Amino acid sequence: MSRQEQTPLFSGVVAHAKHNPVQFHIPGHKKGAGMDPAFRSFIGDNALSIDLINIGPLDDLHHPHGIIKEAQELAAEAFGADHTFFSVQGTSGAIMTMIMSVVGPGEKIIVPRNVHKSIMSAIVFSGATPVFIHPEIDPLLGISHGITIEAVEKALDAHPDAKGLLVINPTYFGIAANLKKIVELCHSRDVPVLVDEAHGVHIHFHEALPLSAMQAGADMAATSVHKLGGSLTQSSILNVREGLVSAKRVQTIISMLTTTSTSYLLLASLDAARKHLATNGRDLIGYTIQLADQARDQINAIDGLYCVGKEILGTIATYDYDPTKLIISVKNLGITGYDAEVWLREHYQIEVELSDLYNILCIVSFGDTEREMDLLVKALSELADLHKHGICERSPVSVYVPNIPTLAMSPRDAFYAETEVVPFEDSVGRTIAEFIMVYPPGIPILIPGEIITESNLAYIRENNRAGLPVQGPEDDTFRTLRVIKEHEAIR
């Protein structure tokens, strides 16, 4: 048996459960016996028997030296990392760890503006100053792509004291930059590269997919095993390459951000998922790519719909892409992505990953079969047929994405500053003190410290009218916004 077929953590907790020890420790449900019967019946006794805590035989995520240490070492081997840290705080916890491991108060980190809210949270917690790079905007789809080598070089030239660069690779929509070149550029200046790889756990295991962060030589990568790798929701990993980053510092930070009640269900699922990817991943992902490509061709044969393919490549921001992500533009049907999402839910019980003003995103994984793909194509064909009248007569739909606002003060200073509430319509020109984002994908429209513009307000109104999930402000009716208080001179 090869090393990658071993599951020391999963096998260890199962063996412990089979011994059926008498538990005088938490959790108090005691293998389900003290739990609501309906919930226990639904979850099952196997799962409840390994809902355990860090007792002696089971190691401790905060100080791994036994089965958790072995499982993390196997994961590092599988992903080509020097060290791998398991996260039960999701990829958000891993992302925060990355950032707080390399920057402190007042230090600079270069980040694209289309970052997940966890990145901005880490910047607030650390007190770092973000240097924003404008991501390339796709004018046809209305989505953000990655950052370019040219933009990274300009940022490094302007801010040679930056302590790190964060890259989203691949993006939520599966678009990848030339990560290897970006890493080489940063390393030539001794700047570590941190990768938000939340949507790319699978790319390491198939040559037809973009290079993974570790393959490209990045220093750290927060990788969501639960998203596309087969582990339970909220389980993730942080891969680390030593050199510009200290693994001991990373262990300290991730421990600070991690609950002491670590879920062994989540940890065991990471161990099992790693084995599955390392031993069967290439075949499973190859089949997934085949399913997605077939569906893409069928969707593109439907009048009024467009599913993105290889033709998107070739620009400075679209170096490679993940074909298992189906970006489906519905704008030529005269409806929003949210309209399509709701219709698919109500008529076919199909749930998509996300929708925006112009698109829906469907994620294909090795948990899918031809049955699910055929149902999706059938549903989309019916949806298009409902809106076929007038497709040809419609003029091309232009997409609208507002410019990135000016940052007036650091997000941390804004977050902790004295604030006041003003009417939404009167907030133009004021400095925002709260996050506003559409979630999913969790990319901020405004972050604390930015100056509010009319185009930002118009974009918020448009998303709200479309029914999209705009989140963040204290006032979820959007009648008011919290801004930095302005002090007038005493007369």
UniProtKB/Swiss-Prot annotation:
Disulfide bond residue pairs: none
SUPFAM superfamilies cross-referenced by the UniProt entry: Ornithine decarboxylase C-terminal domain, PLP-dependent transferases
GO MF, one annotated term: arginine decarboxylase activity
Pathway listed: Amine and polyamine biosynthesis; agmatine biosynthesis; agmatine from L-arginine: step 1/1
Modified residues (N6-(pyridoxal phosphate)lysine): 227
Keywords: Cytoplasm, Decarboxylase, Lyase, Polyamine biosynthesis, Putrescine biosynthesis, Pyridoxal phosphate, Spermidine biosynthesis
Pfam family, one: OKR_DC_1
Catalytic activity: L-arginine + H(+) = agmatine + CO2
Originating species: Halalkalibacterium halodurans (strain ATCC BAA-125 / DSM 18197 / FERM 7344 / JCM 9153 / C-125) (Bacillus halodurans)
Swiss-Prot/TrEMBL cofactor(s): pyridoxal 5'-phosphate
Protein name, UniProt field: Arginine decarboxylase
GO biological process, one term: putrescine biosynthetic process
PROSITE patterns: OKR_DC_1
GO cellular component annotations of the record: cytoplasm
UniProt cross-references to InterPro entries, sorted A to Z: Orn/Lys/Arg_deCO2ase_major_dom, Orn_Lys_Arg_decarboxylase-I, Prn/Lys/Arg_de-COase_C, Prn/Lys/Arg_de-COase_C_sf, PyrdxlP-dep_Trfase, PyrdxlP-dep_Trfase_major
Localisation: Cytoplasm
Chief location category: cytoplasm
CDD domains in UniProt: Orn_deC_like
Functional summary from the UniProt entry: Catalyzes the formation of agmatine from arginine.
UniProt similarity note: Belongs to the Orn/Lys/Arg decarboxylase class-I family.
